[in-house]
């Protein structure tokens, strides 16, 4: 376009805002082909010039950044700031792409997608883990899905068995697969190797073996059924197919002393329908030691030596004697009257 044609075009042009013509020496603002007087190129809300020429356009009207945010920009559900540019709409809220993150692992979800879980937005792996936790199941560490059947445990992690093949024969593995020296084998191939299997963890035993309860065990896995501490070569006691350390075997199955309430180790004194340590069986009045050969009487469910008994008031001794006679009479079997029939 020649200079004369340009002048003619400007002479016929009008301001986009006020529709007035331009004077020949006037400065004109051109915004995407739209012409404005310099004083007309202002924010449609506050009527002020755009700071540094930056403006936002909405429905044919131009706004400064502040007014555009106040009028139209959504607030981020995470940081609370206005969102300019891409908006993520999810969970009945608006988000900056960088603010919309998994509530458990903090990974960005904008381009990954998310799953709603108990009012939370989670990435799919975290959702699967939470789902598995609620069902009491494992999550496969390869595909990150719930393992509905029995998992294959490999290097302390759970997997779907069909992700692996036997190192020896190449067959797809099942949950019965065995790990040996960092490799996985199907059960038949593993059994051919003659490696013992631990009765606790069901894994091969490559070092020292403990033979007990008709099974083989890793040393650290052969433990007391009560306290779960390894025996580590110490003596164990067996009961109904389980192994116990001496302390807990005595606590569970041994006699408890009526006096000290401890499990009785060694000889047991049985008297007054109770069990006593040899050292605890004594006169409850003078504390002199008693044996079953000594004469004693029962008073307040405890033994009293003959010497202390003789010091009791006469009335008390009569009552004790009568009580003893009644007790012995009840203990005797009743005679049958043959003439009563």
UniProtKB/Swiss-Prot annotation:
Cellular localisation = Nucleus; Cell junction, Focal adhesion; Cell membrane
What is one GO cellular-component annotation here? plasma membrane
Q: What is its main location?
A: nucleus
Membrane topology label: Peripheral membrane protein
Q: Which domain of life is it from?
A: Eukaryota
Residues that bear Phosphothreonine: 327
Swiss-Prot/TrEMBL keywords: Cell junction, Cell membrane, Disease variant, LIM domain, Limb-girdle muscular dystrophy, Membrane, Metal-binding, Nucleus, Phosphoprotein, Repeat, Zinc
Q: What is the effect of changing residue 323 to P?
A: In MDRCMTT; uncertain significance
Residues annotated with Phosphoserine modification:
328
Key word Cell wall biogenesis/degradation present in the record? no
Q: Which GO-annotated molecular functions does the record name?
A: metal ion binding
Name the GO terms of the biological process aspect. Answer: cell-cell adhesion; cell-cell junction organization; cholangiocyte proliferation; integrin-mediated signaling pathway; negative regulation of apoptotic process; negative regulation of cholangiocyte proliferation; negative regulation of hepatocyte proliferation; negative regulation of neural precursor cell proliferation
The disease tied to this protein in UniProt is: Muscular dystrophy, autosomal recessive, with cardiomyopathy and triangular tongue: An autosomal recessive muscular dystrophy characterized by childhood-onset of muscle weakness progressing to a severe quadriparesis. Additionally, patients have biventricular cardiac dysfunction due to dilated cardiomyopathy, and macroglossia with a small tip resulting in a triangular tongue.
Q: What does this protein do?
A: Adapter protein in a cytoplasmic complex linking beta-integrins to the actin cytoskeleton, bridges the complex to cell surface receptor tyrosine kinases and growth factor receptors. Plays a role in modulating cell spreading and migration.
The protein depicted here goes by the name: LIM and senescent cell antigen-like-containing domain protein 2
Lineage, broadest ranks: Eukaryota, Metazoa, Chordata, Craniata, Vertebrata
Q: Which gene encodes it?
A: LIMS2
